[in-house]
């Protein structure tokens, strides 16, 4: 078998991604920075009435002290075109940017302003990169170790540190040479022809695509510590985390969505999170500058996502790059989270020294095991016994076992593609073994798979969408799957309703809490259940899940341009209860369902056929 893998592919990919102008800086979507130089412009606003300044702006921060409101407009993944509208105090402006032949063009257009409202163009060297900056009238020069970048601003108002211009008319900024507003506008319009447009490419799901593409594109940023482009869940999560934070299953799902039309970012994110693997052999719950959850992982979805990315793009180097780490992680689950053939979530104590972080609160405790589940405060785990000797929940977890079996099968297929026949067999056998144990969690009387208390041997009736995950791995037969849908999915006392699926059954005492994983709707749950439904002859359920997920996403996307972290299961609102970021990328999985339903994504239930 031919193997052209060199081991340099990932570095070469990042070298291509991390260059040129874009909104690379985490702290503000109004900052435009050139890589690798690190020279950039931070656009700020001054309120003419109060003299207050908006120094940083992020999408979805209406409830923060600064209270800016941003409508995220079209944006290419590489930042060659960006557009947004910003409202703050009495200022309402549109900001457009374009990059052509590595030159930056910015156009700031007032929509509604008052007298003395101003734009401040503040140049700087980002991330402590070396360079000298000088300002002369309406021009800025950035002398870096790579090149000298010249910027020109229409209008006057120079100070020693920045350029302040009135917003009573449009402001044009260009690099390379001075240009008029009309010339910059011409460049903007030229670049605008390259923006992703759901209406032309994804005609059956245009706004689902636009929501997904924009939340991914606007949350793509630069990690200066590791010199990489990544797509974290939300900039709002990253700012207090030191500039970036990666969560395990969130990042894999982002990579899956990105694989639709940005192969490079899909690869980059799948590699980034997988390469955060710990010395113990698991991909951690979360990682950020100086912090990594060394006690716990998160729901395993990595091999499945990598398999699907490969199915879309057929480049084996990605499989070679990630296979060994995915295999270590796969074996880690069986070696460290198995209790009598069942899998349960846990947390491994370790000495984290004198440096304290809030995520350390759960180490070696039930809280940490709940965090490993990814369902932090789910009522499923309220009354679970936590074994302080092995540091695991004493609960056979239907959702975890299903996801793990799916990982075993996915990684087995990848092993087959790579010609690793012994490992392929190992993984196939492991999947079969856990599938047999999962079958024992079927409750014939109740018509659903149920978590089981491993102390008492009793089933738990705290019902969550995770109990439908066995559909993912075809453990139920058609009759069982039909019962699951009829008796539980379509049961209005449990999961059915105008908005679905609540993270705990509607008749559960915790449903009324409407707080995080206690009743609210989460896109990854819908997505995983939808993938499972596709494995069966359940056409109505498949259609209903796609349609209701679409309607839920579009309820807040149309008009608000928000993609929420989670949603109210009664009203479909995303911002009614706190703890729901307004621009969180996995919320777009609600739209990815519809995009997949219309055939724009390779069918995940079909096996890999390329074994050459």
Annotated model-derived regions:
Residues 216-225, 262-282, 322-341, 430-447, ...:
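Long, well-ordered core segments of solenoidal/helical folds
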Residues 202-307, 311, 319, 327, ...:
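Substrate-binding groove/exosite segments of carbohydrate-active enzymes
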Residues 1-204, 208, 535, 573, ...:
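Terminal accessory carbohydrate-recognition/targeting modules of carbohydrate-active enzymes
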Residues 181, 185, 202, 206, ...:
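Generic detection of long, well-ordered alpha-helical segments
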Residues 183-190, 207-215, 318, 479-484, ...:
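Exposed alpha-helical structural elements
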Residues 2-41, 45, 298-313, 443-488, ...:
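C-terminal capping/lid segments that line or modulate ligand- or cofactor-binding pockets
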Residues 227-237, 498-505, 561-565, 606-608:
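Short coil/turn segments at secondary-structure boundaries
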Residues 159-174, 280, 284-301, 307-317, ...:
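The feature captures the catalytic groove of carbohydrate-active enzymes
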């Amino acid at each position: 078998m031919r193997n052209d893998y060199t081991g340099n592919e990932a570095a070469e990919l990042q070298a291509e991604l991390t260059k040129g102008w874009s909104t690379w800086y985490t702290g503000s979507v109004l900052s435009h920075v050139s890589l690798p130089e690190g020279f950039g412009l931070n656009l700020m606003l001054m309120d003419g009435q109060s003299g207050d300044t908006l120094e940083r702006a992020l999408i979805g921060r209406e409830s923060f002290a600064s209270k800016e409101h941003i409508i995220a407009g079209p944006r290419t993944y590489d930042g060659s075109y960006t557009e947004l509208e910003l409202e703050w105090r009495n200022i309402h402006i549109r900001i457009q940017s374009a990059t052509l032949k590595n030159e930056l063009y910015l156009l700031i257009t007032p929509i509604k302003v008052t007298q003395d409202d101003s734009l401040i163009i503040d140049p700087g060297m980002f991330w402590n990169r070396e360079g000298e900056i000088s300002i002369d009238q309406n021009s800025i020069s950035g002398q870096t170790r790579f090149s000298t970048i010249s910027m020109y601003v229409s209008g006057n108002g120079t100070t020693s540190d920045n350029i302040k211009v009135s917003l009573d008319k449009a402001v044009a900024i260009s690099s390379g040479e001075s240009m008029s507003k009309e010339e910059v506008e011409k460049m903007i319009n030229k670049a605008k022809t390259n923006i992703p447009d759901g209406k032309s490419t994804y005609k059956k799901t245009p706004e689902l695509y636009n929501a997904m593409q924009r939340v991914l594109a606007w949350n793509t940023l630069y990690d200066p510590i590791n010199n990489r482009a990544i797509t974290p869940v939300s900039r709002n999560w990253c700012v207090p985390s030191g500039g970036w934070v990666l969560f395990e299953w969130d990042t894999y799902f982002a990579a899956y969505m990105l694989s639709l039309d940005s192969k490079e970012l899909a690869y980059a994110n799948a590699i980034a999170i997988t390469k955060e693997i710990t010395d113990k052999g698991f991909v951690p719950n979360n990682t950020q500058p100086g912090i990594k959850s060394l006690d716990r992982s998160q729901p395993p979805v990595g091999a499945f996502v990598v398999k699907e990315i490969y199915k879309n793009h057929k480049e084996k180097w990605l499989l070679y790059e990630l296979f060994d780490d995915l295999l270590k992680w796969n074996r880690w689950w069986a070696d460290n989270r198995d209790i009598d053939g069942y899998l349960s979530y846990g947390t491994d104590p370790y000495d984290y020294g004198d440096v304290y972080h809030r995520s350390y609160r759960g180490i070696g405790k039930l809280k940490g095991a709940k965090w490993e589940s990814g369902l932090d405060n789910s009522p499923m785990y309220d009354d679970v016994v936590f074994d302080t000797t092995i540091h695991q929940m004493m609960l056979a977890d239907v959702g975890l076992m299903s996801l793990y079996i799916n990982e075993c099968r996915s990684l087995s297929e990848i092993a087959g593609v790579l010609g690793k026949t012994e490992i392929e067999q190992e993984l196939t056998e492991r999947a079969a073994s856990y599938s047999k144990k999962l079958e024992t969690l079927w409750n014939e009387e109740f018509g659903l798979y149920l978590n089981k208390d491993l102390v008492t041997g009793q089933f738990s009736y705290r019902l969550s969408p995770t109990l439908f995950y066995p559909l993912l791995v075809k453990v139920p037969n058609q009759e069982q799957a039909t019962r699951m849908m009829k008796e539980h999915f379509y049961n209005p006392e449990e999961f059915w309703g105008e908005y679905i699926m609540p993270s705990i059954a509607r008749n559960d005492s915790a449903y009324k809490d409407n707080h995080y994983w206690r009743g609210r709707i989460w896109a990854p749950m819908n997505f995983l259940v939808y993938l499972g439904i596709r494995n069966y002859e359940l056409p109505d359920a498949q259609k209903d899940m796609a349609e209701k997920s679409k309607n839920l996403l579009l309820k807040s996307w149309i008009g608000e341009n928000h993609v929420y972290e989670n949603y109210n299961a009664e009203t479909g609102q995303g911002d009614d209860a706190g703890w729901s970021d307004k621009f969180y990328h996995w919320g777009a999985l609600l739209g990815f369902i519809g995009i997949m339903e219309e055939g724009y994504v390779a069918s995940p239930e079909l096996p890999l056929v390329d074994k050459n």
